[in-house]
Structures are given as structure tokens and as C-alpha cells.
Swiss-Prot record:
One term under GO cellular component: plasma membrane
Coiled coil spans: none
Membrane-crossing residue ranges in chain numbering: 42-62, 67-87, 122-142, 153-173, 198-218, 225-245, 256-276, 291-311, 320-340, 361-381, 401-421, 498-518, 561-581, 588-608, 615-635, 687-707
Membrane topology: Multi-pass membrane protein
Signal peptide stretch: none
Main localization category: membrane
Keyword Secreted attributed: no
Keywords, alphabetical: Cell membrane, Membrane, Peptide transport, Protein transport, Transmembrane, Transmembrane helix, Transport
Location in or out of the cell: Cell membrane
Native source species: Mycobacterium tuberculosis (strain CDC 1551 / Oshkosh)
Function field: Involved in peptide utilization.
Protein name per Swiss-Prot or TrEMBL: Peptide transporter CstA
InterPro entries hit by this protein: CstA, CstA_N
One Gene Ontology biological process: cellular response to starvation
């Protein structure tokens, strides 16, 4: 029988649902639901909108009385419901227009290693775990310095209108191009000049991003036997789950999920016991350098092993811990009704001289929150691993848009863990050592001088707060992660266990942070491998083979290049705490948002090329906002005369001290530290310029191509010809009644995918 073509599409309508066939001789490959919105649904969505509007009113305008954290959770939840049901649906209908009779890259190129059609629940778990890393946890905690109101608005509204849109549409254009990487799509759609800039610049950006994420993991796990044991156990558990689904019980996702959750909980609980044994403390109390090498080895393995064996099941497994803990925190907010201690808008929002980070609300609030609302890193996953696992185009909305929406909710909860803390303790945790000298007495004096509302803090209060979580000190525990753990412990002990379990929850939170962030390191490494392969393949000759992921020598070689790049920077940061990656951390937010600018540029151009100029505002408005934020931030970082903001000004000040033979200057306490600052500010400033040049080249090329397209003279659309699908799978995480009925008819396990017979 001749292979069917997409033009053979047949729809058989039955009631409010239609069965879609790629060919009359094949079983259905999709169910299209066309049920009109009922009165009950209308009442529900109107009620959600009204409740959400009321919650936002309380959050935004109540100034003379304390605001309960529950209002922010309600406002966020209602906004997400309306956004997903209506705005995401608008994008699906007007821009994406999914065709489930078209085969996805996973179905067309199924090789059992990189391209593997995977159950949408596992894909959602992998995708969410891969995109949600340090950004949505740490960024909102640091941004609390500016107040809870601007942060909460940007996290929620920014995600619905920008972050979720970017993720959904990058996934869409990558799926339509056989899962190509972001850099390769820039070259294909915008031309060679922009393509070269992107294929060179994006790998540099992603290297820094992965190294920063890995450093947070190392810091969390160093000398933490509980965390090391529990996270190490997720690897054999994931391999077991992968083999179980692949060989023992194919399609039984719910079954293996229950087994995996049970084993994961056992690993978490037993980790506390192991940490208190002599052998456990000896085996799993690892130095930062040892953890670096183990993390590098794991990243390489996750990049080259079949995606079904380690990466996908481990990310899916981690999602249960991530979502479960965030849900527990949300329940804690609703049960404990904590009062927000942070001001709606702090004085640091305007002055720009806050102790946590320097800079005014615009643009640095948006840079600091980073992945919580809009994440360029997500675009790498949406054009990396996820499109190579997707079963059907109809699943893109729940995975792309819904995945980022879930990440945004994580950021909301992270914001609340910091906002409910006594603000004197918040700034005690986050004030630099330069101001506190790591002393409770000095910290109390410094924090009390910030002009915060509420009762002044005492050294005894600070010491008691540290003792309550089993720590020697909480003074100047900068970086955001310790504050998040302290806030999580503060919230969870009110709901489960009381004061006696506060220390347990604190150390659980440290382990949770490492588990949460590690999934972005492994998926990011694999996505970067695809990008390196695409970039080198453009040189032609024998390197052309690198663009074929099935060529294993190329996959191994590119993976080695990627882990060597971020691993070397990670080792530098660990062995030289004052230099290397620590000084690159301020670049993380800007680099991430500049990457989003590249992704949104490509999306906007593709929408125009497809003849949907009328809807180009959907990605176009977020693009303009992102460029305004990131280019302003980059300008200030490069040219500001304030040494706390401008890299080159700080470089000049420390270089002058170096030339004068100073042995101490600013935050540097000796000559070696002065040399470190001089070197690292030079690297920071140089990379800032490089990143801006790359983005400007891509945006200018995008504008030129878009204008030529409108005039009928643009570069042709680089979309691959569709291939007919022979695979059926439900579109949503929960199958509809019609989908379940068809599944039973086809004899598949509940909710699983089914391949049509040849």
C-alpha cells in the first residue's frame, strides 16, 4: 500500500467529536472535540475571573492593613486558568493550528535514542523538570528586595503573555522542522549572518547558564550526605522506570509512576537516616570538587544515553517531588494564612541601592526574576529534547504553555517564602559580608539602619533564628537559596510538625533545591549537544554527519565538548570562590533574557512568513518589552558610572587600586582578591558586549526578513514538508471520554499512545 499523504486527511464527525484519519485504510490518529462552551462552563469562568479580579485588587490596592499571602495564590491561580483556557486557546487556533494527522519528529525519526515518541505525561514531567531550575526559585527571592507587588504582577502576567507564549511557539516551530535547535532555526529563517552570530553566541550563553545552575547544585550538596544520597538514588530508580516502561509493561505509565513515587519517597526519608550513620556521613559527605566531577560525569551520561533510559524518567520522577513540594507549600499558605511582611513596593525600587543587588526596578527587577516569567533557557529545551519526544502536535499547548505556567507558579511560591519572612531577617540573610562582617551583632546594627518597618532585630534574635533550623549562622547567606530554604521551613513547620520539625524542613528544602535544579543541568547539556551538532554540521564535509543525532560518535564528541565547557567553568568557580562562575552569576539573568529575545525574534518572523501578520503581535509585544528590558540593563552594566552597577567602572576602580599597590580595596581583603575582581569584571564586561552584539544582529536580521516578507521578497519558510501520522495519543494530560473510548477500541492501556497497524 502506498504511503498516505497529509492531503488524504479524513474527518468522521460523531456528535461533538470528530475522528481524524491520515488515510481511509488506517485507524484514527486524533480526536477533535468541538463541544460548544456550556452555560455551566461560562458561569465557572466568569466566577474565576471575578474572584481573580478581587484578589488582584486586594494585592494591589490594600495599603493600610496587612495582606494575606493567600490572596496572591488565588490571584495567580485564577489568572492561569483564564490564560490557559482563552489566551492559549486563541494562540492555538490562530497561530499554531496543530494537525494531529501530521507526524511529529519523534514519530518520523524514531531511533530509540534521541527521537522517541513518549507518553505526554512523561514528556510534561521531563519538560517541566528541564525548564524549572534555579531561576524560578532564586530570582523571586532576590527580587523581594523591591517589594512583593511588582514581582508578583510580572511573574504571573509576564508568564501568561510572554513566557508561556515563547515556550509554546518555539516548541511549535521546532516540531515543524524535525526538532531543529534554536540556533539552526535562526540560520534557516533569518539568513547566514544572523545564523552565524546565533550559532556562536547561543552556545556561549548556554554554557554560562548551565555552569551557574550546576554551581548552585554543588553548593547545596557539598557536605550534605542526605542530599547526595537521595539524589544519587534517583538515578537507579529512573533507569528501572525506563526499562519497566520499555520492556516489562509498555504504556503502563500510571503503574510505574506509583512505583517510582514510592521509591523516591523512600530515598528521601532514608536519606535523613543515612546522613546520621557513620558510614553514610563518610561515603556521602563529598567535597565541592568531587561533586563537580560527579556532576560532569552525570551530565555526559544523560546526554548520550537513550532518552527513555535515564533523562526522561529521571526528570519525570523529579517532577513529582517538585510539584508535590510546591503543592504542599501552596496548601501551607492556604492553611496557615501567613501575612506578607515585605512592603508592596520598597524604597529600594526607586533608589537602586538595595543591599541584595544594585539597580532600579526597571530593568533589574525583570532581569533578576528571570526564568520565573520569561526564560530564554526554556527555548533551548523547547527546541532541544522536548520536540524529539512529542507524540502529537495537539499536545504542544499543555506541554509548552502549561509547562511554563507551572514554572511561573513555582516562582510565585518562592516569592511568598521570602515575602512572609521578617524583613530584618530577610536582609540579614541576604546582606553582603562587606556590611555584616558575618557577625550577628554587626548584621543587626546594619539591618536596623536600613529603615525597615517593624521591630528592630537583635543579635540574640538572629542567633535563635539560626539555631531553629540547625545552623550556626544565617548572616550573609547570600545567593537566594538559603533564604528560600529558610522561608520554606518557616511555612512548612506551621502546617506539619511544628517548631520541632523546622530544622528537618530546612534541610529537606536544601535537598529539594538541588534536586529541582539538577534536572535543568542534564536536559540543558543534551539540548546544548544538539545545538553544537547543528552548528558544526553547517561546515559541511564529514562534519555534516554531526547533524544526524543517530551518528553516535558525533553525539559522544559533541557531548564531551559541552560538558568540558561548562565543567571547566564550574571547577573554576568552586576552586576560586571569588572568581570564575561567581562573578558570572550577574550575567545569568541578562544572558537568559537576551536568549529570549533571540527566540521571540525567530517566532515573530515565522508567524509573518506563514501569512499570519495579523497575529504577529502575540510574540511581537513580548519581544519589544524584552528588548527594552535587556538592552537597557546591558547598557547600564556596560556604561554606568556607578561601580556597583557598571562592570567597566568597577573594573577601572579596582585596576587603579591594583596599580597603586593596594592590599585591600572595597570588598577585596587582599591583593589576590583585587586581581580576581580586575580579571572577572573584564570578563563580565566583555561578555556583556558580545551578548548584546549577537542579539542586535539577530533582531536587525529579523526586521529585514520580516519587511521583505511583507513585501513579497523574503527568505522562503524553512519548514519541512509534513508526513502522515499513524500514531494515536490523547491531546491533554487527561484523555477525554471520546479518546478513552477510542483507546479501548484499539486495545491500548488506558491513556497510552497507539501505533496504527501497517
Amino acid at each position: 500500500m502506498a504511503a498516505p499523504t497529509p492531503s488524504n486527511r479524513i474527518e468522521e464527525r460523531s456528535g461533538h467529536a470528530s475522528c481524524v484519519r491520515a488515510d481511509a485504510d488506517l485507524p484514527p490518529v486524533a480526536i477533535l472535540g468541538r463541544s460548544p462552551i456550556t452555560l455551566r462552563h461560562k458561569i465557572f469562568f466568569v466566577a474565576v475571573a471575578v474572584i481573580g479580579a478581587l484578589a488582584w485588587t486586594v494585592v494591589a490596592f490594600f495599603r493600610n492593613e496587612p495582606v494575606n499571602a493567600v490572596w496572591i495564590v488565588v490571584a495567580a491561580g485564577c489568572t492561569y486558568i483564564i490564560g490557559f483556557r482563552f489566551y492559549a486557546r486563541l494562540i492555538e487556533m490562530k497561530v499554531v493550528r496543530p494537525r494531529d494527522d501530521h507526524a511529529t519528529p519523534a514519530e518520523i525519526l524514531d531511533d530509540g535514542t534521541d527521537y522517541v515518541p513518549t507518553d505526554r505525561r512523561v514528556v510534561f514531567g521531563h519538560h517541566f523538570a528541564a525548564i524549572a531550575g534555579a531561576g524560578p526559585l532564586v530570582g523571586p527571592v532576590l527580587a523581594t528586595q523591591m517589594g512583593y507587588l511588582p514581582s508578583s504582577i510580572w511573574i504571573v502576567v509576564g508568564a501568561v503573555l510572554a513566557g508561556c507564549v515563547q515556550d509554546y511557539l518555539v516548541l511549535w516551530i521546532s516540531v515543524r522542522r524535525r526538532g531543529r535547535s534554536l540556533g539552526q532555526m535562526v540560520r534557516d529563517e533569518l539568513g547566514a549572518t544572523a545564523g552565524v552570530a546565533a550559532l556562536v553566541g547561543i552556545p556561549v550563553i548556554i554554557t554560562i547558564v548551565i555552569a551557574v545552575l550546576a554551581l548552585v547544585v554543588v553548593r547545596a550538596l557539598a557536605k550534605s550526605p542526605w542530599g547526595v544520597f537521595s539524589i544519587a538514588m534517583t538515578i537507579p530508580i529512573a533507569i528501572f522506570m525506563g526499562c519497566y516502561l520499555r520492556f516489562l509493561r509498555p504504556g503502563r505509565v500510571s503503574e510505574v509512576s506509583l512505583i517510582g513515587i514510592g521509591l523516591l519517597l523512600l530515598a528521601v526519608v532514608s536519606g535523613d537516616w543515612v546522613a546520621h550513620t557513620s558510614w553514610g556521613a563518610a561515603w556521602f559527605s563529598l567535597s565541592p570538587v568531587t561533586l563537580c566531577w560527579l556532576l560532569i560525569s552525570y551530565g555526559f551520561a544523560a546526554s548520550v544515553l537513550p532518552v527513555w533510559l535515564l533523562l526522561a524518567p529521571r526528570d519525570y520522577l523529579s517532577t513529582f517531588m517538585k510539584v508535590g513540594t510546591i503543592a504542599l507549600l501552596a496548601i501551607g499558605v492556604c492553611a496557615a494564612h501567613p501575612i506578607i511582611e515585605a512592603p508592596a513596593v520598597s524604597k529600594f525600587a526607586g533608589s537602586g541601592n538595595g543591599p541584595v543587588f544594585a539597580g532600579s526596578l526597571f530593568p533589574f527587577l525583570f532581569i533578576t526574576i528571570a526564568c520565573g516569567a520569561l526564560s530564554g533557557f526554556d527555548a533551548l529545551i523547547c527546541s532541544g529534547t522536548t520536540p524529539k519526544m512529542l507524540e502529537k502536535e495537539g499536545q504542544m499547548r499543555v506541554i509548552g504553555y502549561g509547562g511554563m505556567m507551572t514554572e511561573s507558579f513555582v516562582a510565585v511560591i518562592a516569592l511568598l517564602t521570602a515575602a512572609i519572612l521578617d524583613q530584618h531577617l530577610y536582609f540579614t540573610l541576604n546582606a553582603p559580608s562587606l556590611h555584616t562582617h558575618d557577625s550577628a551583632a554587626t548584621a543587626a546594627k546594619y539591618v536596623n539602619g536600613l529603615g525597615l518597618t517593624g521591630s528592630p532585630v537583635t543579635p540574640d534574635h538572629i542567633s535563635q533564628a539560626a539555631a531553629s533550623v540547625g545552623e550556626q549562622t544565617i548572616v550573609s547567606r547570600t545567593g537566594g537559596a538559603p533564604t528560600l530554604a529558610f522561608g520554606m521551613a518557616e511555612m512548612l513547620h506551621r502546617v506539619v510538625g511544628g517548631v520541632g520539625l523546622k530544622a528537618f524542613w530546612y534541610h529537606f528544602a536544601i535537598m529539594f533545591e538541588a534536586l529541582f535544579i539538577l534536572t535543568t543541568v542534564d536536559a540543558g547539556t543534551r539540548a546544548a549537544r544538539f545545538m553544537i551538532s547543528d552548528a558544526l554540521g553547517n561546515f559541511g564535509g564529514v562534519l555534516r554527519k554531526l547533524q544526524n543525532p543517530s551518528w553516535r560518535p558525533g553525539a559522544w564528541a559533541c557531548s564531551l565538548v559541552v560538558v568540558a565547557a561548562w565543567g571547566s567553568i564550574l571547577l573554576l568557580g568552586v576552586t576560586d570562590p571569588l572568581g570564575g562562575i561567581n562573578t558570572l552569576f550577574p550575567l545569568f539573568g541578562i544572558a537568559n533574557q537576551l536568549l529570549a529575545g533571540i527566540a521571540l525574534t525567530v517566532i515573530t518572523v515565522v508567524v509573518i512568513k506563514k501569512g499570519r501578520l495579523k497575529w504577529a503581535w502575540i510574540p511581537g509585544i513580548p519581544l519589544l518589552w524584552d528588548l527594552a528590558v535587556t538592552l537597557t540593563a546591558s547598557w547600564q552594566k556596560i556604561f554606568s558610572a556607578d561601580p556597583s552597577v557598571g562592570y567597566w567602572t568597577q573594573h577601572a576602580h579596582y585596576a587603579a587600586a591594583q596599580h597603586a599597590g593596594e592590599t585591600a580595596f572595597g570588598s577585596a581583603t587582599n591583593a589576590d582578591e583585587i586581581n580576581d575582581v580586575v580579571r572577572n569584571t573584564f570578563v563580565q564586561g566583555t561578555l556583556s558586549i558580545v551578548f548584546v552584539v549577537v542579539v542586535v544582529l539577530v533582531v536587525v536580521a529579523g526586521v529585514i526578513v520580516a519587511l521583505k516578507t511583507i513585501r513579497g521578497r523574503g527568505i522562503p519558510l524553512a519548514e519541512d514538508d509534513p508526513a502522515p501520522s499513524t500514531l494515536f495519543a490523547p491531546a491533554g494530560l487527561i484523555p477525554t471520554a471520546a479518546e478513552r473510548k477510542l483507546q479501548r477500541r484499539l486495545g491500548a492501556p488506558a491513556s497510552a499512545s497507539v501505533a496504527a497497524p501497517d
